[in-house]
Regions:
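Bacterial Sec-dependent N-terminal signal peptides
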Residues: 2-34
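Disulfide-stabilized, aromatic/cysteine-rich ligand-recognition loop
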Residues: 240-242, 261-324
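Short, well-ordered junction/capping motifs at the entry into regular secondary structure
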Residues: 166-175, 216-250
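Active-site microenvironments of metalloenzymes and redox enzymes
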Residues: 50-51, 63-209, 262, 320-324
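Active-site-proximal beta-strands of protease catalytic cores
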Residues: 251-259
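GGW-centered surface loops in extracellular recognition modules
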Residues: 21-39, 44, 171-172, 177-180
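Short, polar loop/linker segments at the starts of domains and inter-domain junctions
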Residues: 45-66, 230-238, 278-304
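Chymotrypsin/trypsin-fold serine protease catalytic domain
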Residues: 197-234, 265-270
Length: 324
């Protein structure tokens, strides 16, 4: 099941124009591997409505540790490279099991391009792929069987099981590991807003722009589809980046976050190519029931697989801890 809820900005930009050590932040520094450094800090002004990560920041400041985030959504090219390595029979007992995904919004690989974001993958698939990518790059996997068993979770199950050690949704999260992982919802929104609460773009409606007339230059969504006659996902980096140098934080595909919305639902953010502009703001929250079946057709995302939360409009991008 897919639902989206608004967390619109509840603060004026002047609340953030004060002196701080965020001035001309280092956020936005790109490395050779396609990751952008996001300088951590403390958000102490309310932004967004109830339910958003920084809603209670005025009463309870929220501290974000520095982290690295991929400058683009995970492409099908990168997904497939890791998938083929991870699912090879040569890996024996350490072989991974996960969904192969779509090339953009196309199941048929004769359409689209490998530089479109991978789609049609569940939250479980994303978690397991992160572990596979970490192992392939000789990094420390983040999602483990348990606190006492450091075996990486390698199975993205296609059952409705929601309990038991070693399941993707019940993995032990090694917060000290240096491998790839999904961003928390707070990390995602912090980066989407530009990685600095004291810059003007922190309060923009969209990632990188505040003017819907210019949104076509920053986001792949219904507004840009109508203007550019697009009928599908776009290659990453087709639009302009936000203040931090991140592409497609608004539009193209929704991006899985690690956080739970409920015990059976996980959050994704950013909006997608088949959605109107108001779904692609930095404060819209989507969530999907990827762990159990649902018969509520009224809120069903277009072509969403109700059991596994998969859609041609949902993908992800990865982050890594900094200073690890």
């Amino acid at each position: 099941m897919f639902i989206a809820t608004s967390c619109s900005n509840g603060s004026s930009s002047k609340d953030y124009q004060e002196e701080s050590d965020f001035s001309q932040t280092a956020s936005g520094k790109n490395d050779s591997n396609g990751f952008v450094y996001i300088k951590g800090g403390t958000v102490s002004k309310r932004v967004g409505k109830e339910g958003c990560p920084f809603y209670n920041a005025s009463e309870t400041p929220v501290t974000i540790e520095s982290f690295y985030i991929a400058e683009t959504e995970t492409t099908y090219k990168k997904w497939l490279e890791v998938y083929e390595w991870a699912t090879s029979d040569e890996r024996g007992e350490e072989k991974y099991t996960l969904n192969k995904g779509y090339q953009g919004n196309y199941e048929d690989k004769n359409y689209g391009t490998p530089l479109m974001p991978v789609t049609f993958l569940s939250w479980r698939d994303a978690i397991v792929w992160c572990n596979a990518a970490s192992e392939m790059d000789k990094l420390e996997p983040v999602y483990l069987i348990s606190k006492t068993d450091n075996t990486p979770v390698r199975q993205a199950e296609t059952s409705t099981v929601t309990s038991g050690f070693g399941k993707a949704e019940n993995a032990y999260v090694d917060k000290s590991a240096n491998g790839y992982r999904l961003p928390t919802e707070a990390e995602w929104e912090y980066a989407a807003r530009g990685g600095n609460p004291y810059i003007e773009s922190w309060n923009y409606d969209y990632s990188g722009i505040n003017n819907i007339e210019e949104l076509v230059d920053y986001a792949v969504c219904i507004v840009s589809n109508l203007k550019n006659k697009l009928t599908n996902t776009a290659e990453v980096k087709s639009k302009k980046p936000n203040y931090a140098g991140l592409y497609d934080m608004s539009g193209n595909v929704w991006e899985w976050c690690y956080d739970e919305y409920s015990s059976t639902e996980r959050i994704f953010r950013g909006g997608g190519w088949i959605y109107p502009a108001n779904f692609c703001t930095v404060d819209y929250r989507g969530y999907a029931d990827n762990l159990k079946n649902s018969s509520d057709d009224a809120v069903k995302i277009i072509d969403l697989d109700q059991v596994y939360g998969k859609s041609s409009a949902v993908g992800f991008r990865v982050v890594r801890n900094a200073n690890k």
